[in-house]
Every structure is written in C-alpha cells, then in structure tokens.
C-alpha cells in the first residue's frame, strides 16, 4: 500500500503579521508552485469580554489559530528536524507571537517554540487541537474528551492533523458525522491521508441559539449567518423567528458570532452556541432553535500512537479498505459477511472515491468498454482488536482487499446525553 503523504507545513507568520486588507482567508498562488492560506480580516479595533484581544489580529495571536501552507515539492533541500527526525518535506516556520491585551493574557495562551516537543510528561497539560474558534462546538467536544486540557484552535481540519503530527498538539478532536447532516467527508479523507490513530470518540448534543448584539430585537434582523449545516438544522425555527431575513452561509458557527461582534452589526444575527454568546458579548434572542431535538455530532479523538485494546469494556474498531474486484463478484458482500458470521455488529459503513484510482475502465468484447467508479470503504464495528473474533474477521477481509488499514480500536462513548444545553455547549 502506498501511503499518501503530501508535503504539508504550518506557518504562523500570517497570524503574527496579518494582512488586514481581506475579509476572510484567501488562497495565493505563487508561480503555480505554492499555495498559502492567510487568515486576515478587516475591522476596526474592538474588544470582547473575558479579555479576548482588541483587534482581529490580536485575537488571532491570542488563540494561536494555525495557518496552513503547502510547500513546493522542489524545495527538497531544506531539511526540518522534529524531535531528532529529519523530514525534507516539512517547513517548520512556526514562531507564534505572545500577545496581551492591556497587560492581561488573552482567552487562550499563544503557542511558543517550546511546543515543538514530545508528548507531555506527568504533570504537563495536554494540548488538544480542534477546528474552529473559541465557542465552537468542537471546542466543547475537546473539553469533554480531555477535561482541563489546553485547547488549540485551528483554522482548517487538516491543520489540526498537522498540529498533532508536528508535536504542536498531543491530541486532536474532530467531527466525523452528525445525526442530521450525515458524514463529514473531508475528515474521512484526512484519516486516510494522515497517519494518526483513533484513540476514542465523544458525542455532543448540538444546541443552537439565535444571537445578536445587546438591545437588538428579532424584528430588526435582516440577515442570519452561520455554518450551512447549522442553518439547515434550524430552518423551521428561522422561518418563524425571522421570516424576512436573508440566510447566508458562514464558515463556522462561533466565527459568525465573532464577526457580528467585531463589526458591530445591529441588523445581523448568528446561529451559534450559548458559549459563543458569552465569549463575544452577544445576547440570546432565542434558545434551542434546532428543529430536531435529537441533533448529535460524533467526534473522534486522534493521537500519534494507538492505545492498547482491551476487553473489559465496550470497544469500537474503525478500518478502511479497498476491495479487489478480480477476486470475483460480490466482493463487498463477502467482506461484510466476515463480520456477520462472527456476530460482529457494524455501526457504520461509508464509501469514498479511491484517491489513486477513482475510475476503473473495463473492456469486454461483447458489450464494449465500461467505466466503474472505484471506492475505499470505511467501516466501524463493535469489537476490540484484543478479541480473537475481530482478528479472525480482519484476516478474512484481507483476502478480498487490495489494502486494509486499522484506523483505531478504542472505547465507545457510553455516556448518556441530554437534549438540554450543557454549560460548555
């Protein structure tokens, strides 16, 4: 199996010296060889409660939002060293700045160069990367998965993966599916591309609120912004609360709340969490506006090293494989039967286009040439890799696959959840 390992690197220079001429992250192409993502923003000076910076740039530095940069493969002469291991494809230009607001530390302490170190020893704070800004549901998931940890917000999903790989973070907590919106395909693709291991899962009830600046009434709202999934999950409530308001998609729920506060928008509301309202000084116009009370998002906990599977509690195992068509017909049926014959329950199966060979051309002298889409399959099943039945099932599955990889064997999240809002969501 050939591992997909593009030359990625993280760069925080755009956070240290932000370009305040753009409104959102933009992509710059340099001679067709390099793509960089700059987090930049236009706004006047402002201040949030709880000591969140005095400008967008200060806030970014305080939160240490990682900016990603794809480095040209031709730049193979520069060799970076991480914990004694050299890697010619990684550029460690990671020098985050320290920022304070009126002499006081910001909401989240910025990264320092000492963060490029091994996993914390006894007594050290665990560093957990998540995608989004403070107040996002991913932050709540990170807090539930690893209480008393140091949360590291990242601007993109793949940056969170890189943060763990480069020892900037010790864990990553990322969403993979929602009970209403379905799978988050981007993260499934990243699980295959990166070599991190699933070490746990956590489920978070999604409790949406309608937020606006203090003093703004619902009938004054002409625009509602939020993440597309949040807007879809609150469509019925928004039609009743703000029937004349325009609905606009935003890249993140908490970032939508931050945007309203930063630009002092009295005609705009955001769909976000109650914590986002607290962080950015907004009022809650309506609480619990999700159309379905059973709205839950499942997050995976990722680490550089796998955990040791056990049998003293319910475990779940996640795998990814590609079927071998030359093994005959009904290959997928044979693969899934390996679990059924051993009384192993499947909790999820997801297909994604094969990254190396998305289309297979088949020629037949009788019917002509046909094209078939090639897929990789992600499967979750309820068994621990410490069990003989799971090992035997995968041994049989391997007979019908061109590649098979165990993404992780980890404890199931068995904690009951409530549709009522929690303190951290």
Curated annotation (Swiss-Prot):
The keyword Lyase applies. GO terms for biological process: defense response; L-phenylalanine biosynthetic process. Residues 1-38 form a transit peptide. Keywords: Amino-acid biosynthesis, Aromatic amino acid biosynthesis, Chloroplast, Lyase, Phenylalanine biosynthesis, Plastid, Transit peptide. One of its GO terms (molecular function) is prephenate dehydratase activity. Residues 127-304 form the Prephenate dehydratase domain. Converts the prephenate produced from the shikimate-chorismate pathway into phenylalanine. This is Arogenate dehydratase 5, chloroplastic. It comes from Arabidopsis thaliana. The lineage of its organism: Eukaryota, Viridiplantae, Streptophyta, Embryophyta, Tracheophyta.
């Amino acid at each position: 199996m050939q591992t997909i390992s593009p030359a990625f690197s993280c760069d925080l220079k755009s956070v240290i010296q932000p370009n305040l001429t753009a409104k959102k992250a933009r992509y710059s192409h340099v001679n067709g060889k390099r793509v960089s993502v700059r987090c930049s923003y236009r706004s006047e000076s402002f201040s949030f409660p709880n000591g969140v910076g005095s400008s967008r740039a200060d806030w970014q530095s305080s939160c240490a939002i990682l900016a990603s940069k794809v480095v040209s493969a031709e730049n193979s002469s520069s060799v970076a060293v991480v914990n004694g291991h050299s890697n010619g494809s990684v550029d460690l230009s990671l020098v985050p700045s320290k920022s304070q607001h009126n002499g006081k530390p910001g909401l989240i302490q910025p990264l320092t160069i000492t963060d490029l170190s091994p996993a914390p020893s006894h007594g050290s704070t665990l560093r957990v990367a998540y995608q989004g800004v403070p107040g996002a549901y991913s932050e709540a998931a990170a807090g539930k998965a690893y209480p008393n940890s140091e949360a590291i917000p990242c601007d993109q999903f793949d940056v969170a993966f890189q943060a763990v790989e480069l020892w900037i973070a010790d864990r990553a907590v990322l969403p993979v599916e929602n009970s209403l919106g379905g799978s988050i395909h981007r993260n499934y693709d990243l699980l295959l591309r990166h070599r991190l291991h699933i070490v746990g899962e956590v489920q978070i009830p999604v409790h949406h609120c309608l937020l606006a600046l203090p003093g703004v009434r619902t009938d004054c709202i002409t625009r509602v912004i939020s993440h597309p999934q949040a807007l879809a999950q609150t469509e019925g409530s928004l039609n009743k609360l703000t029937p004349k308001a325009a609905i606009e998609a935003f890249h993140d729920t908490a970032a939508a709340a931050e945007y309203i506060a930063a630009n002092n928008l009295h005609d705009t509301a955001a769909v976000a969490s109650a914590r986002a309202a607290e962080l950015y000084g907004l009022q809650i116009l309506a609480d619990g506006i999700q159309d379905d009370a059973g709205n839950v998002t499942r997050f995976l906990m990722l680490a550089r090293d796998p955990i040791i599977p056990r049998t003293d509690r319910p475990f779940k195992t996640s795998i990814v494989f590609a079927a071998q068509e030359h093994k005959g017909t009904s290959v997928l049926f044979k693969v899934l039967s390996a679990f059924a014959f051993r009384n192993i329950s499947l909790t999820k199966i997801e297909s994604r286009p094969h990254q190396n060979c998305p289309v297979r051309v088949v020629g037949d002298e009788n019917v002509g040439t046909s094209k078939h889409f090639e897929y990789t399959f992600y499967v979750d099943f309820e068994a621990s890799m410490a069990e003989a039945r799971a090992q035997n099932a995968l041994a049989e599955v391997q007979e019908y696959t061109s590649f098979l990889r165990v993404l992780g064997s980890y404890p199931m999240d068995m904690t009951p959840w409530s549709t009522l809002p929690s303190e951290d969501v």
